[in-house]
C-alpha cells in the first residue's frame, strides 16, 4: 500500500498540471460547418427583418458552436430587438465568456481583447471596458488595431452611436 502513495501523488500532480492549461472546446468541424450554415441563414433572415427566425437560427448555431463569441453577440442583438432583454444579457455574457476563453488560449492576439471590450460595453459595463482597454494598450502598444481603437476613441464613438444604443443593455 505504501508503494502506491508516491504513484498516487504523481498521478494527482500530473492531472492538476494538465487541468490548469486552457483547452480549446471540443467542437467537431462538422458542428462548426453546420453552425456557419445556420449563421448564414440567420443573416439572410436579418436582411429580411425576420428577427424571430434569425434568433432561432442563432440559438441553434450557438448551441453547436458555443465558443464563438461573435455568434453570441448576434444572438444577443436579435434578442434585444425582440424585447427579450434578460435573454439578451445571457447571450452577451456568453459572448464575453467566449472572448475571455479565447484570450486564455491565444493571449498574444489583441483583437480578442478588443472583442471583450465590445462585449463589456454591450453589457453596460463601460468602466470595466475602459479598464480592459488601458490594459490592452499597455500589453500591445505596437499593435495597429489597438492603437487605432484607442487613439481614434472608438469606444466613445461606439457608445454614442444610435445603433449601439439600440442593441446595448
Where are these regions (language model features)?
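Alpha-helical segment of the N-proximal tetratricopeptide repeat
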Residues: 31-60, 64
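Terminal, low-structured helical/coil segments at or just beyond the last alpha-helical repeat
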Residues: 25, 130-169
Amino acid at each position: 500500500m505504501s508503494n502506491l502513495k508516491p504513484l498516487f501523488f504523481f498521478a494527482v500532480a500530473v492531472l492538476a498540471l494538465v487541468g490548469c492549461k486552457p483547452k480549446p472546446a471540443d467542437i467537431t468541424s462538422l458542428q462548426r460547418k453546420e453552425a456557419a450554415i445556420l449563421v448564414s441563414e440567420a443573416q439572410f433572415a436579418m436582411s429580411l427583418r425576420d428577427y424571430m427566425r434569425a434568433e432561432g437560427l442563432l440559438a441553434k448555431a450557438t448551441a453547436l458552436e458555443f465558443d464563438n463569441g461573435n455568434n453570441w453577440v448576434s444572438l444577443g442583438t436579435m434578442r434585444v430587438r425582440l424585447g427579450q432583454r434578460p435573454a439578451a444579457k445571457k447571450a452577451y455574457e456568453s459572448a464575453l465568456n467566449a472572448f475571455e476563453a479565447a484570450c486564455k488560449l491565444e493571449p498574444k492576439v489583441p483583437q480578442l481583447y478588443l472583442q471583450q471590450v465590445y462585449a463589456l460595453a454591450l453589457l453596460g459595463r463601460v468602466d470595466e471596458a475602459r479598464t480592459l482597454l488601458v490594459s490592452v494598450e499597455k500589453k500591445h502598444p505596437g499593435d495597429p488595431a489597438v492603437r487605432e481603437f484607442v487613439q481614434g476613441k472608438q469606444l466613445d464613438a461606439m457608445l454614442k452611436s444610435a445603433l449601439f444604443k439600440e442593441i446595448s443593455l
